[in-house]
């Protein structure tokens, strides 16, 4: 085929068509009740009436993966970074009590590699399956003047729904509520500019370095996908009146736990009430970070926190265990005096 004007400008239209064909099977496995239309429509459609909600409230979220992408690019491993993208979006709207309904992705790249693009979308579809959300649309933009040939950026967008009377908003959490933490898989998708600095700039580790404290090569540890908490937490919401939910992302415990509180409340976190994953000890050691800095930046092994009444703790733990989740009582809500997050025993600064 003769090279057209667009190709001469650096945009491979044929490669774009190949991507669409390659991803169809991945999109198909995410279909759920309510989806209307087919891949390739101008707009993705979803029938809200299929949910049988009396007063539906739509909850939306958007996020990316940050500089974790640079590790995926350097390692040439692209099949799980899409899970991270989905997780960052759906876990956020779950904090409002919403069930994710559908997801859209956006990939911008310097050169469209159909195999690589398929791997990225495969990860997105895997994440959508875990979340029960349909992948109903997306965009792959080839922009050779903006990105290097091997570079790409990834962002996602999700919409969920919740019955209005079950919407979780600030104000429901009360002094005396108990905090239940659900484990993370590792670093998840925040703090990677610092992570990369610690390992590859300040200490000159190789991607596949074997570190004694870790049970997998370094890059495998750093690329572990962010956990998606949707299905187990939705089961809890069916059986327990959850007062608050926090997705522990950028800003760690210090920034995120107060987001579910009113200004007159604080949380007391019981240090030692859950196992700290080895990767955090390794980063603290090689990054020469103090304890407070770690809790200000990272999830420290807890990816989501629920606030429930004391009398609902046993039921909450029971439902989580029944759904394959380890869970820990990690603290309580108190009346605020000074700081909004208090660590029992204090932290080294």
From Swiss-Prot:
Primary enzyme class: ligase
Subcellular location: Cytoplasm
Domain of life: Bacteria
SUPFAM superfamilies, sorted: PurM C-terminal domain-like, PurM N-terminal domain-like
Enzyme Commission code: 6.3.3.1
Tagged with keyword Ligase: yes
Protein name: Phosphoribosylformylglycinamidine cyclo-ligase
Gene that encodes it: purM
GO biological process entries: 'de novo' IMP biosynthetic process; adenine biosynthetic process
UniProt GO cellular component terms: cytosol
One Pfam family, short name: AIRS_C
Record-stated family: Belongs to the AIR synthase family.
Entry keyword set: ATP-binding, Cytoplasm, Ligase, Nucleotide-binding, Purine biosynthesis
Catalytic activity field: 2-formamido-N(1)-(5-O-phospho-beta-D-ribosyl)acetamidine + ATP = 5-amino-1-(5-phospho-beta-D-ribosyl)imidazole + ADP + phosphate + H(+)
Keyword Nucleotide-binding: yes
Gene3D superfamilies recorded: PurM-like C-terminal domain, PurM-like, N-terminal domain
Top-level taxonomy: Bacteria, Bacillati, Bacillota, Bacilli, Bacillales
Pathway assignment: Purine metabolism; IMP biosynthesis via de novo pathway; 5-amino-1-(5-phospho-D-ribosyl)imidazole from N(2)-formyl-N(1)-(5-phospho-D-ribosyl)glycinamide: step 2/2
InterPro entries linked: PurM-like_C_dom, PurM-like_C_sf, PurM-like_N, PurM-like_N_sf, PurM_cligase
GO MF annotation list: ATP binding; phosphoribosylamine-glycine ligase activity; phosphoribosylformylglycinamidine cyclo-ligase activity
């Amino acid at each position: 085929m003769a090279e057209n004007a667009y190709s001469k400008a650096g945009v491979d239209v044929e490669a774009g068509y190949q991507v669409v064909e390659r991803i169809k099977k991945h999109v198909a496995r995410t279909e759920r009740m309510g989806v209307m239309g087919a891949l390739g429509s101008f707009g993705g459609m979803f029938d809200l009436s299929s949910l049988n909600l009396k007063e539906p409230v739509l909850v939306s979220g958007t996020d990316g993966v940050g500089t974790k992408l640079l590790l995926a690019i350097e390692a040439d491993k692209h099949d799980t970074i899409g899970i991270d993208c989905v997780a960052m979006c759906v876990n956020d709207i779950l904090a409002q009590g919403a069930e994710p309904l559908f997801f859209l992705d956006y990939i911008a790249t310097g050169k469209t590699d159909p195999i690589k693009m398929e791997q990225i979308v495969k990860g997105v579809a895997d994440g959508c399956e875990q979340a029960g959300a349909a992948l109903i649309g997306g965009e792959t933009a080839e922009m050779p003047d903006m990105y290097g040939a091997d570079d790409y950026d990834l962002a996602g967008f999700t919409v969920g729904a919740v019955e209005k009377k079950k919407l979780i908003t600030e104000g429901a959490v009360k002094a005396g509520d108990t905090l239940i933490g659900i484990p993370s898989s590792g670093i998840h998708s925040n703090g990677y500019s610092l992570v990369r600095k610690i390992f590859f700039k300040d200490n000159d580790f190789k991607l596949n370095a074997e570190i004694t404290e870790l049970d997998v090569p370094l890059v495998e540890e750093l690329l572990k996908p962010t956990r998606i908490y949707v299905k187990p937490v939705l089961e809890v919401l069916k059986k327990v009146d959850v007062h608050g939910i926090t997705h522990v992302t950028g800003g760690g415990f210090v920034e995120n736990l107060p987001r579910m509180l009113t200004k007159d409340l604080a949380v007391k976190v019981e240090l030692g009430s859950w196992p700290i994953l080895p990767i955090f000890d390794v980063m603290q050691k090689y990054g020469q970070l103090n304890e407070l800095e770690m809790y200000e930046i990272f999830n420290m092994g807890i990816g989501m926190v629920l606030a429930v009444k004391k009398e609902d703790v046993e039921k909450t733990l029971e439902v989580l265990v029944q759904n394959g989740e380890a869970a820990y009582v990690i603290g309580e809500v108190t009346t605020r005096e000074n700081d909004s997050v208090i660590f029992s025993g204090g932290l080294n600064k």
